[in-house]
């Protein structure tokens, strides 16, 4: 699942861009039978009933939304909250503002390599991604001959255009060291694997320079920011 941190900067939501904005995105999980057990639009009434069981919370909610819990107000509230999930002040942010000591020499070399390879062409904007849709298999068979699923169609599932097949929203690179697994199909478990895939399928390189990979990883790790003044941390939730 894509991270919700900095999602407010994305032009579209989800890997396939099926949600035009945060509010549409917020309406997806509640009506996904796999995620929350509901499926039909009428199920918002059941969700509202559960939320109303907490009378104190319901009273507070009505101070902002006098009409109470509805599909519209619930998703609007979630979207407004997600707009606060911004993670500025990463070491790289501080470096760009003039603090030469904010990142290591290897990270600086990695940044120069990032630019040399043209990575910023797609990973652009305040979130360093989320602005465009690109082909996963631009320079090679990303899927490696494996059986493809409907999710592998990418943007085509939304636009119904054959030319959008295998196009996916470029992910943000902010906090990327914490947002594994990578790719739309979670086929890369580490940054090194993700970079290797990009080298091959996006840039068309057959041979991989391990030193360059280490430099790029050093740079990418400087993109981890802060939330409400505290460093963002990656914590694995226990299985239910």
Q: For each predicted feature, which ranges?
A:
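Periplasmic c-type cytochrome electron-transfer domains
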Residues: 1-240
